Amino acid sequence: MRIDEWLSSRLAKTKAAGLYRSLKLPQAERTNWASNDYLGLANDKRLIHAAETALRRFGAGSTGSRLTSGNTAWHEKLERKIAGFKQTEAALLFSSGYLANVGVLSSLPEKGDVILSDQLNHASIIDGCRLSKADTVVYRHKDMNDLEEKLRAAQSRARRFIVTDGVFSMDGTIAPLDEIMLLAKQYRAFVIVDDAHATGVLGEAGRGTSEYFGVSPDVVIGTLSKAVGAEGGFVAGSKTLIDFLLNHARTFIFQTAVPPASCAAACKALDIIEDSRAKRRLLQSSVNTIKRSLVDIGFTVNGEDTPIIPVMIGDPQKAVQFANGLKEKGIEAPAIRPPTVAEGESRIRLTVTAERRLKDIEDLLEGFKLMGRELNLVK
């Protein structure tokens, strides 16, 4: 059997289950409710100007890893800015948040250790756990009783690591980081938090879940590609942690460095984010309006005080029909299906940005009302 025949058979099963994916170019006439650019910084002229300046000075690419030819003043400046923003001693850049998670989890825990991972953690955390020499134990989503029970059972292990998303990307829920930190202290565990969807959004200055709860986890991971509006990932923590990762995290050592232009854009974004309190309040107001209105229409809406709004559909094929119907009405909002979410929990995932105006929100709600009735999801 040729490889294409075998793969075609597997793809046919994917299509039959309503789980087939394909790439499509965005349409300018559609309003984008799928973007993670929460503060609208990706197209901000100040970021573009900063990137252009670095582009002319350093060129389009970084030419190598940070440990060979790819280290520039912009990389080191951005790491200092991230450390200051996250209020840690130091920070280390990765080419993506995905690589940051994999790098941390595959290098820090050792054989004989245990990682306690939230049930709904991002795929990059799951993959990092799989690559670790430590065992992984999954605890129920945000269930502190279950986490404590599993911590108690792990007391004979050499070390215990609790890893959690700060904001869960498909559910819009917030990890109870204050409670996690208390359990970590009680059971002598280290805490690793992935703040990809919280950075720039949660906390008075947008510093993420650490600021939101007033705590200091051992390891803070994040991305520069969401609210920051640039590209790349990072780890923030103690100088010793960063020195260790620089020497042991394979996804840092063997990666090509983030382009200097992206570093320059991210530096400018971090300056802007700390002064964007009014924009964050506007964003949360829009989120509250949309969630309240969708519930009034008759939809089941999950999530907490974050820009991620999961509108539950259930059946994956209906979710795809719903998303396609919204596209015809000028609305871009993706259907999220297994294996990204559990069976029976397919949904339309809305992400709200500070750029959305009242007319955009009105059009969105009208589109949901019409599609909900068309598919007999609401009355």
UniProtKB/Swiss-Prot annotation:
Amino-acid positions noted as binding substrate in the UniProt annotation, renumbered to this chain: 21, 122, 340
Assigned EC number: 2.3.1.47
Short name of one Pfam family: Aminotran_1_2
Chain positions recorded as pyridoxal 5'-phosphate binding sites: 97-98, 169, 194-197, 223-226
First-tier enzyme category under EC: transferase
Keywords: Biotin biosynthesis, Pyridoxal phosphate, Transferase
GO MF entries: 8-amino-7-oxononanoate synthase activity; pyridoxal phosphate binding
Cofactor: pyridoxal 5'-phosphate
Pathway membership: Cofactor biosynthesis; biotin biosynthesis
Positions bearing N6-(pyridoxal phosphate)lysine: 226
The keyword Transferase appears for this protein: yes
Domain of life: Bacteria
Example GO biological process: biotin biosynthetic process
PANTHER family: CLASS II AMINOTRANSFERASE/8-AMINO-7-OXONONANOATE SYNTHASE, LD36009P
NCBIfam families, alphabetized: bioF
Function: Catalyzes the decarboxylative condensation of pimeloyl-[acyl-carrier protein] and L-alanine to produce 8-amino-7-oxononanoate (AON), [acyl-carrier protein], and carbon dioxide.
Complex and partners: Homodimer.
UniProt record similarity statement: Belongs to the class-II pyridoxal-phosphate-dependent aminotransferase family. BioF subfamily.
The protein's name: Putative 8-amino-7-oxononanoate synthase
